[in-house]
UniProtKB/Swiss-Prot annotation:
Record keyword Iron present: yes
Membership in a protein family: Belongs to the class I-like SAM-binding methyltransferase superfamily. RNA M5U methyltransferase family.
Keyword Iron found: yes
PROSITE patterns: SAM_MT_RNA_M5U (PS51687), TRMA_1 (PS01230), TRMA_2 (PS01231)
Sites where the protein binds S-adenosyl-L-methionine: 273, 302, 323, 372
Taxonomy of the source species: Bacteria, Pseudomonadati, Chlamydiota, Chlamydiia, Parachlamydiales
Protein name: Uncharacterized RNA methyltransferase pc1544
Matches recorded under Gene3D superfamilies: 2.40.50.1070, Nucleic acid-binding proteins, Vaccinia Virus protein VP39
PANTHER family: RNA M5U METHYLTRANSFERASE, TRNA (URACIL(54)-C(5))-METHYLTRANSFERASE
Entry keywords, A to Z: 4Fe-4S, Iron, Iron-sulfur, Metal-binding, Methyltransferase, S-adenosyl-L-methionine, Transferase
GO biological process: rRNA base methylation
Active site (record annotation): 399 (nucleophile)
EC number: 2.1.1.-
């Protein structure tokens, strides 16, 4: 049974509302006797927000629970030949560099800009604070709420295809102080925002978002989400103010304990790890497990903005990154230039198709394959291509260990052996955990 907002040792009253294949889903009604480990949550929205569910659990116990969950998942593969590394902790608060808020209104006309309520399908509550992100996120949200309240612009209603405002995306470069705001609106031309409305939107942000020095930049985007029955959803982005990207730096400890500084540009919709400090630990650990050398050729699959491959470029002969998202590919190529790297090539396209093309081109075979796929994990076609590469080392980073462990079966059947499991906590106060595995061919 799953009961959100509880911890081991709590005695509670819960309301069952759904049975799935392997568990009951329920809502917490009352904690009749709290666990001795229970603490008070810090956030005023805890219990209604769908973002956090573990603020009532001390952080050291959160880490133990996450380690336990990974151990349970990987139990069929853990033996005396597999090294288990303790979970790498994170700063528990104010770690997120990106948030997406939703516009909504109720039948009475009340307007809400915030996060989705826990256990609901799209019900939004008014966000006044979020302790997982920098304080300016909530400050900007309050300013936009005021702008919206003083306008006749409507929140988008998906069923009726009416209204304009869908989401508000907030991003920052932790190391640079750059800030980005993107307003996503519907593609229904009957509800298009006017030029004056967009100008006032930008001005509100310029007035409310404080930049501490002239090197810090603010970027404001409009994104139009075009939906039509029987057709794929299309997005069109328009720069309203500032640079067309934000900048970020990663500080990675070198193998000789010096610090390697790497520069990255991030477009509004491109993927970048949402916890910057923890991304540095994640990538450093991945490079350490790969045990790279100057003769190595590295394939970085699902490379996003090229981060992992760029981090490894200094230590190897050649890096080939593969990414499907065109926007991420453009960023990745710019990031390669930004860091002055001549041994990194970014290929655009489906991983399986690009790998097939590389094999036909007789490109250099990889010594190390690194994969960081989306939550759905590797599909059967991608696994087949990875097995065909026969790389001696495979470093698999996952934001969803459940699909990662599902992928282990066919990889091990294909000849790989699991060597190391390394959990990394990217998202304190939540159940989510990142995981790195090292697999090798005998």
């Amino acid at each position: 049974m799953e009961v959100p907002f509880t911890i081991p040792g709590d005695q509670v009253n819960a309301i069952l509302y759904k049975k799935t294949k392997d568990k009951y889903l329920s809502r917490l009604s009352k904690v009749t006797m709290p666990s001795n480990n229970r603490i008070d949550a810090l956030c005023m929205h805890f219990g209604s927000c769908g973002g956090c569910c573990w603020q009532q659990l001390p952080y050291e116990l959160q880490l133990k629970q996450k380690e336990k969950s990974i151990q349970n998942l990987f139990k069929p593969y853990l033996n005396e030949n597999v090294k288990w590394h303790s979970i790498i902790p994170s700063s528990p608060w104010h770690y997120r560099n990106k948030m997406e808020l939703t516009f909504s209104s109720d039948k009475a006309g009340r307007r809400y800009l915030g996060l989705i309520m826990q256990g609901t399908r799209g019900h939004v509550f008014q966000m006044k604070e979020c302790l997982l992100a920098n304080g300016w996120f909530a400050q900007a949200a309050r300013a936009i709420q005021k702008w919206w309240d003083n306008s006749d612009v409507q929140a988008y209603h998906a069923i009726k295809d009416r209204g304009s405002l869908r989401t508000l995306t907030l991003r920052e470069g932790l190391r640079t102080g750059d800030r980005l705001v993107m307003l996503t609106v519907s593609g229904n031309p009957d509800y298009a925002l006017t030029k004056s409305q967009l100008q006032s939107f930008v001005q509100v942000l310029r007035d409310s978002i404080e930049l501490s020095n002239s090197d810090q930049k603010l970027s404001v985007f409009l994104r139009i989400q075009q939906i039509a029955k029987g057709r794929p959803t299309n997005f069109y982005e328009m720069l309203l103010y500032g640079p067309d990207h934000i900048r970020e730096k990663l500080y990675l400890p070198d193998f000789n304990e010096a610090i390697q500084t790497l520069n990255f540009r991030i477009s509004p919709s491109a993927f970048f790890q949402p916890n910057t400090e923890q991304a540095e630990k994640l990538y450093s650990q991945a490079l350490k497990l790969a045990d790279l050398s100057a003769s190595h050729v590295v394939y970085d699959l699902y490379c996003g903005t090229g981060t992992l491959g760029i981090c490894s470029a200094k230590y190897v002969k050649e890096v080939i990154g593969i990414e499907l998202s065109r926007e991420s590919v453009l960023d990745a190529r710019e990031n390669v230039k930004e860091n002055g790297l001549s041994n990194v090539t970014i290929k655009s396209g489906d991983v399986g198709q690009v790998l097939e093309a590389l094999s036909q081109e007789n490109s250099l075979k990889p010594d190390v394959v690194m994969v960081d796929p989306p939550r759905i994990g590797l599909d059967a076609k991608a696994i087949k291509h990875i097995l065909d590469l026969k790389a001696p080392k495979l470093v698999y980073i996952s934001c969803n260990p459940k699909t990662q462990v599902m992928n282990l079966g066919p990889l091990i059947d294909g000849g790989y052996q699991l060597q190391i499991v390394q959990p990394v906590d990217q998202f304190p106060q939540t159940v989510h955990v990142e995981n790195i595995t090292l697999l090798t061919l005998p």
